Each structure stands twice: as C-alpha cells, then as structure tokens.
C-alpha cells in the first residue's frame, strides 16, 4: 500500500502493529459465503449489463446510455462483516456512481452505504459513506482516498454489530457510527439487510453538484467486483440470536465494541488528511442544530 509522504514515518512505526491488530478481526471469522457470485447473488437490474466470470469469482457491471446494472445477495443478514474487492472506472468517470451497500429495502429502511463518485480525468474519486437508520439519512461523509481506486482492486468492508458500524478500506477504519440508541439516536439494529452493488447514472448530482456530466463518448463504463466474503448472521426471523454473543457471532463480542489503539491512530490519520466533508460539521445544513450523535463519542 502506498500512502502520502507526510504519513510515511507513521506507517513505518505502526506497520507491523496494524497487521497484527487487524488479523484479530479477520482470524475469528467463520465464513458464511465466499467467492461465487452465481451462488450468493442474483441480478436485480439489467442482466445484459452484468458479466460474471466462468468460475463465478468475479463480476463486472456496465453503464452506457441504455442502462446501468445492479445485483443483490440472495440471503439477508443482521450484523456481521462484509468484505468486497472493487476496481473502479478508469479515466473520465464524472457523473457515474458505483455503489456497494447493505439495505433492508423497506419504506423506513436501514442502509449502510459506500458510494464512489466519479470525476473528470486526472481528478480523484470521492468516496461518500452514509447511514440510514429507521428511514432517516442525511449522514454523509466524504473522503479522498490515498490511492487510485481505478488502478487495482482494493477491499472495502462493513463491520456492523450491536455496538457500532465501522467502514474500512483495506482494513483501515475510515468512519465509525456508534450505537447510541439509549440516548435516542436511531441505529440499524432490527431490520435484516441484503448486500447490494450497482453502477448508475448520477450526473445530476455526483460530480461537483451535477456540473460535470457523463461523457458518453468515453463509455461504456465498467466497474469490477471480486473476492468478496460475507461473515454474518443469516436472517431466519430470530432477532435475539443475531443480537447475541457467541462463537459464531464473533462481531458482537465486547472486543469489537470499539477500535483498538492502533486502529484509532489510523482513523485519526484518515480524518486529518483525507476527510473533505462531515455532516457533523455542516452547521448551515442543519440550521445550527446538528444531529444528536454529532455531540456524542465516535469511539
């Protein structure tokens, strides 16, 4: 992994520590499903714009003037960890949106979003994250990544448990959303969610507020997905089972209720050098009355 120069002394100091720390998060997993898109997912929009490798290990979505495309997991889940490797659109990608997310698909839906907002050639992608809880959203954060996400595959992860939601890029935490339900803050905790991905035309808003439109002469636009892992509680109608702590539900254990010391340092590094928008800093948007969670601890 190549990081910006100003961070290199930090990387050298903690490189070994973060690897050791992150292995703890991964090593306790008992994989629910891993690898075959044909077995674990189904196409939800425009099958002609979805291409899956013969072995089912990789899948691409295509966007052209006719259509975008999407797919969804067959199962739904209540808590767990989801990892997906993604390679974004190269070159002129302005106006395009690649989304990877979990959603309950209900009117008052819960949703946990990664949205990759394309840009003109030579300008960086914006990664927007969002959390819907009981139908309420407006919780966007945006960062610039420290690498070119269209050059190679990178792993984007969601850890969702009874304590917190952690968004991760290559196992580095970039955003936290804690369960402050006891203080009146909505948190996704009752609705099972499917894992979904899509590629679509977002030129009305995605790049510079809709100023930069899709250049269709550069299409078709292709995003690639692969090497996913779903280690989560499969929904069978039993909320108490998925809420519990057990060997299978490792993510709910107390050790995953907050970040480790090393992860906190990485999180602060991302916030300092790569954060470009945080709804909790947008006083104008909320008429100087920020959402309650903005005044509560992040970890």
Swiss-Prot record:
Keywords: Apoplast, Cell wall, Cell wall biogenesis/degradation, Disulfide bond, Glycoprotein, Glycosidase, Hydrolase, Secreted, Signal, Transferase. Gene3D superfamilies: 2.60.120.200. GO terms for cellular component: apoplast. Residues 30-225 form the GH16 domain. Xyloglucan binds at residues 115, 128-130, 138-140, 204-205, 209, 285. PROSITE patterns: GH16_2. GO terms for biological process: cell wall biogenesis; cell wall organization; xyloglucan metabolic process. It is found in: Secreted, Cell wall; Secreted, Extracellular space, Apoplast. InterPro entries: Beta-glucanase/XTH, ConA-like_dom_sf, GH16, XET_C, XTH. Pfam families: Glyco_hydro_16, XET_C. SUPFAM superfamilies: Concanavalin A-like lectins/glucanases. Disulfide bonds join 233-242, 280-294. The active site is at residues 111, 115. Its EC number is 2.4.1.207. One of its GO terms (molecular function) is polysaccharide binding. Glycans are attached at residues 51, 238. It catalyses: breaks a beta-(1->4) bond in the backbone of a xyloglucan and transfers the xyloglucanyl segment on to O-4 of the non-reducing terminal glucose residue of an acceptor, which can be a xyloglucan or an oligosaccharide of xyloglucan. It is an enzyme of class 2 (transferase). Coiled coil: none annotated. Belongs to the glycosyl hydrolase 16 family. XTH group 1 subfamily. Catalyzes xyloglucan endohydrolysis (XEH) and/or endotransglycosylation (XET). Cleaves and religates xyloglucan polymers, an essential constituent of the primary cell wall, and thereby participates in cell wall construction of growing tissues. This is Probable xyloglucan endotransglucosylase/hydrolase protein 10. The lineage of its organism: Eukaryota, Viridiplantae, Streptophyta, Embryophyta, Tracheophyta.
